[in-house]
Design a protein with these regions (language model features):
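Non-catalytic, C-terminal membrane-associated alpha-helical segments of glycosyltransferases
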Residues: 285-332
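A short, conserved alpha-helix in the catalytic core of glycosyltransferases
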Residues: 196-249
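A conserved acidic beta->alpha catalytic loop
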Residues: 29, 44-52, 67, 97
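Conserved donor NDP-sugar-binding/catalytic core segment of glycosyltransferases
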Residues: 99-167, 171-178
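Glycine-rich, basic loop-to-helix element that forms the pyrophosphate-binding segment
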Residues: 65-82, 92-94, 170
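Acidic donor-binding/catalytic loop of UDP-sugar-dependent glycosyltransferases
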Residues: 50, 72, 94-107
Length: 332
């Protein structure tokens, strides 16, 4: 008789920065799904606004960082000393639907191998309901695949108008080194993507402890954005699989923790895209990443932040190339 698959234990890590109420909502959604041997850790990235006190009043285990060193460093801090078998990440502006944790853990019931996946990425849906945006509407979300969308108000959503849209079914990388969410803004009822995917989305995912520790966790110098793309590259370079688990559903308030049109987002995203391409991609992809950035600088309205990101990436390129050469020589 076939033995039932044992459910691995999990440590869930949520990173907070000055968003205590959002973080509490996320924690409540996942806390009720925890089993024996599981843990939930909230890392506060030096919010300095009373967040830690509010989180502790909720009964949450809070680890305080002495300074805000970014998302990746926050996750690494929350995973320190981990004894649980699987690390689960949930953005503080996301909500895990019932069955989310069980589905992710079922996909990672065995240690990573050529057959068993090392990591699993969830089905992340955008919160609310959406309709096609009117021409020129400034606050629309844009997808080259499905067009421009705007969020309906709560009353229209309650009437069932509009569409539920996908935020991510995993991470992909294009020919210019751009990491992006698979199925971004695809209506959920039309999403039927395969389980095999290049990488994970750090907003709602899980990774086996063996893989996490072997890779040393997230890169901390990226601060925020592209940590998941970089980690996905490193998983692939080890020959480890990442799979998409449709049954693990989270709903995400897109960009409620950091605006995607802010100068900071554009600068950091530009820098990290180029540095991640330099760290992992073939030379033509790195050149494409640089060329794309130059074109965006000349044509786009965000010249200042793009130029700043390009300058920071250029300063970091020698370090990335040195690391890459050193890694290649040590593997021979």
């Amino acid at each position: 008789m076939t033995q039932p698959v044992r459910r691995p234990s999990a440590r869930v890590v949520i990173v907070n920065w000055r968003q205590a109420e959002l973080t509490i909502r996320a924690a409540r959604s996942i806390r009720e799904q925890l089993g024996d041997g599981d843990g939930l850790v909230v890392v506060d990235n030096a919010s300095g606004d009373g967040s830690t006190e509010r989180l502790r009043r909720e009964g949450l285990t809070v680890v305080e960082s002495s300074e805000n060193r970014g998302f990746g460093a926050g996750v690494n801090l929350g995973a320190l000393g981990m004894k649980e078998e699987v690390l689960v990440l949930l953005n503080n502006d996301a909500v895990a639907e019932p069955g989310f944790l069980e589905a992710l853990l079922a996909a990672l019931s065995n240690p990573p191998s050529a057959v068993a996946p090392a990591a699993a990425t969830a089905r992340i849906l955008l919160a609310g309901r959406w309709k096609p945006a009117a021409p020129g509407q400034p606050d629309a979300l844009v997808s080259p695949r499905t067009g421009r969308w705007t969020r309906l108000d709560d009353q229209a959503a309650a009437r069932g108008e509009g569409e539920v849209l996908v935020n991510s079914t995993g991470n992909l990388v294009d020919a210019s080194g751009n990491g992006y969410d698979r199925d971004w803004l695809v209506p959920a009822e039309r999403e039927h993507s395969p389980s095999e995917v290049f990488g994970l989305c750090g907003g709602a995912c899980a990774i086996r402890r063996e893989a996490w520790q072997a890779l040393g966790g997230f890169r901390e110098d990226l601060f925020m954005y592209y940590e998941d793309t970089d980690l996905s590259w490193r998983l692939r370079e080890r020959g480890w699989r990442v799979i998409y688990v449709r049954e693990a559903v989270a709903r995400h308030e897109h960009a409620s923790s950091s605006g995607t049109e802010s100068p900071m987002f554009i600068r950091v995203n530009t820098r990290n895209r180029i540095l991640t391409a330099a760290a992992h991609s073939p030379a033509p992809v790195v050149m494409q990443a640089l060329a794309r950035t130059l074109v965006r600088t000349l044509r786009g309205p965000q010249r200042g932040p793009v130029m700043s990101g390009l300058a920071q990436a250029s300063a970091g390129l020698p370090r990335e190339l040195y690391r890459r050469m050193r890694g290649s020589s040590s593997s021979q």
